């Protein structure tokens, strides 16, 4: 049975794919995934792949991140990163344009975990409260993250205490995203 985050992520992913169908007449197409295998690939073209989200199998979690840093990560983040394989998806939340990060494959999921470990180690070194990034912004210094203490979704400037709460929960945040094609 899916939890709220998995349901909200699946619903946004469906809206994203439908927006592609309506505006471009196809499933999402990405140039950056050419030559990288994934269960998401529906068809390969000379300069891009057409893809759609697929269930995350085998079941997994961010346990490696928890073990490496001896912390407990919010269950919502496990559900976000380990419920589906998909390409990164462009979206808007209120006035904020963002790219929602996803794991493209099992290898990519391992890379995501390594990046999360690096992010959390840096935060610990700087004595910042822990966050788990879930989306990027045009500015390379700003990301959208889930606060691991409160469960709130925040826009933060990396390496600083500058944070702005966007949503009270990850499921609320995901349900209010508008796909950008």
Swiss-Prot record:
Known function: Interacts with the SecY protein in vivo. May bind preferentially to an uncomplexed state of SecY, thus functioning either as a chelating agent for excess SecY in the cell or as a regulatory factor that negatively controls the translocase function.
Compartmental location: Cell inner membrane
Membrane topology listed for this record: Peripheral membrane protein
Record carries keyword Cell inner membrane: yes
Keyword match Ribonucleoprotein: no
Keyword entries, A-Z: Cell inner membrane, Cell membrane, Membrane
Name of the protein this chain belongs to: Protein Syd
UniProt record similarity statement: Belongs to the Syd family.
GO CC terms in record: cytoplasmic side of plasma membrane
HAMAP family in the cross-refs: Syd
Residues making up the signal peptide according to the UniProt record: none
């Amino acid at each position: 049975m899916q939890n709220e985050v998995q349901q909200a992520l699946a619903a946004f992913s469906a809206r994203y794919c439908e927006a592609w169908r309506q505006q471009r007449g196809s499933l999402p197409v990405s140039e950056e995934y050419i030559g990288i295998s994934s269960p998401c690939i529906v068809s390969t073209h000379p300069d891009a792949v057409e893809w759609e989200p697929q269930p995350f199998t085998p079941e997994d979690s961010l346990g490696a991140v928890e073990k490496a840093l001896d912390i407990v990560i919010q269950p919502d983040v496990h559900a976000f990163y380990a419920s589906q394989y998909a390409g990164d998806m462009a979206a808007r939340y209120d006035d904020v344009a963002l790219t929602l990060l996803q794991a493209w494959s099992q290898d990519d999921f391992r890379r995501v975990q390594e990046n999360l470990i690096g992010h959390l180690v840096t935060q610990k070194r700087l004595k910042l409260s822990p966050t788990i990034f879930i989306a990027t912004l045009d500015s390379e210094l700003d990301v959208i993250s889930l606060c691991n203490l409160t469960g709130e979704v925040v826009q933060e400037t990396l390496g600083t205490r500058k944070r702005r709460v966007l949503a009270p929960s990850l499921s609320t945040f995901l349900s209010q995203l508008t796909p950008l094609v």
